[in-house]
């Protein structure tokens, strides 16, 4: 009696599973980079929103918001900083009078100086001294571009370069 076997051999099944695994890996890698690009696009839009809010504040008050009181009560915080991943951002929002966007990942922990950390957050710094209220720095970091950014400061300050992120510098025309 001659019986023909119907079905798949173990080797054929293993080959199919291996091919599916390879395809799944490629698809997941593509989705991951697409998510990073989408978060970066949101970051760039958020930075523009925050800049617009700062300019409106400047028009109404003749100065940018001082962040000297924003970080009070936060251990090891620089008194001129506001970081979107800790309580100082809420104080910044209160001072601005609006709700400001937060980074899509928003995972910085530590002392408030996110440039020394590896997480993602927005970081507002009101410059003190003669520049108080006339200049600010707004830092952000992209996932798909790790190059630093920089700009020449005002009020007699030299160039400021972010070692782990980009930043924009705003200043009043008279500043």
Where are the regions that the model predicts?
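Short, surface-exposed interaction loops/tails
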Residues: 130-175
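Active-site micro-motifs of SAM-dependent methyltransferase domains
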Residues: 33-36, 56, 66
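N-terminal alpha-helical signal peptides/signal-anchor transmembrane segments
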Residues: 44-62
């Amino acid at each position: 009696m001659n019986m023909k076997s119907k079905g798949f051999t173990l080797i054929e099944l293993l080959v199919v599973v291996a091919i599916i695994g390879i395809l799944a890996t490629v698809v997941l890698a593509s989705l991951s980079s697409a998510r990073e690009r989408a978060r970066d696009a949101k970051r760039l839009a958020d930075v523009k929103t925050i800049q617009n809010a700062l300019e409106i504040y400047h028009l109404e008050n003749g100065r940018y918001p001082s962040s000297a009181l924003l970080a009070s009560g936060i251990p090891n915080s620089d008194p001129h900083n506001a970081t979107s991943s800790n309580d100082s951002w809420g104080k910044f929002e209160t001072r601005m009078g609006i709700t400001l966007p937060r980074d899509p990942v928003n995972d910085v922990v530590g002392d408030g100086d996110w440039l020394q950390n590896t997480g993602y957050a927005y970081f507002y710094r009101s410059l003190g001294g003669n520049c108080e209220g006339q200049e600010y720095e707004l830092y952000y970091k992209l996932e798909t571009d790790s190059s630093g950014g920089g700009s020449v400061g005002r009020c007699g300050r030299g160039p400021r370069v972010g070692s782990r992120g980009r930043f924009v510098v705003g200043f009043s025309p008279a500043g």
